[in-house]
From Swiss-Prot:
It comes from Mesobuthus eupeus. One of its GO terms (molecular function) is potassium channel regulator activity. Belongs to the long chain scorpion toxin family. Class 1 subfamily. InterPro entries: Long_scorpion_toxin_alpha/beta (IPR029237). One of its GO terms (biological process) is killing of cells of another organism. GO terms for cellular component: extracellular region. The keyword Signal applies. Keywords: Antibiotic, Antimicrobial, Cytolysis, Disulfide bond, Hemolysis, Ion channel impairing toxin, Potassium channel impairing toxin, Secreted, Signal, Toxin. The keyword Signal applies. Expressed by the venom gland. This is Potassium channel toxin MeuTXK-beta-1. It is found in: Secreted.
Length: 91
């Protein structure tokens, strides 16, 4: 039962993140919805890692360039799942 709740919470967070909710909203939700335990710590870590990830980066080639032009007016480069503005790949 608890595993189903965790999966449901995670899928709900993924769905709501596309609506513009930020990481702090999900952290607050996890804090109040999940009792204090190792499970809460794991969920908060997952929310933090997912919040830092920019999924559009590897899927859409121009995502980082558009993102960095909006923020810093620099060329954007995809480094794994993160966009780096003005920092080309070091290969």
């Amino acid at each position: 039962m608890q595993r189903n709740l965790v999966v449901l919470l995670f899928l709900g967070m993924v769905a709501l993140s596309s609506c513009g909710f930020r990481e702090k909203h999900f952290q607050r939700f996890v804090k109040y919805a999940v009792p204090e335990s190792t499970l809460r710590t794991v969920l908060q870590t997952v929310v933090h890692k997912v919040g830092k990830t920019q999924f559009g980066c590897p899927a859409y080639q121009g995502y980082c360039d558009d993102h960095c032009q909006d923020i810093e007016k620099k060329e954007g480069f995809c480094h794994g799942f993160k966009c780096k503005c003005g920092i080309p790949m070091g290969f």
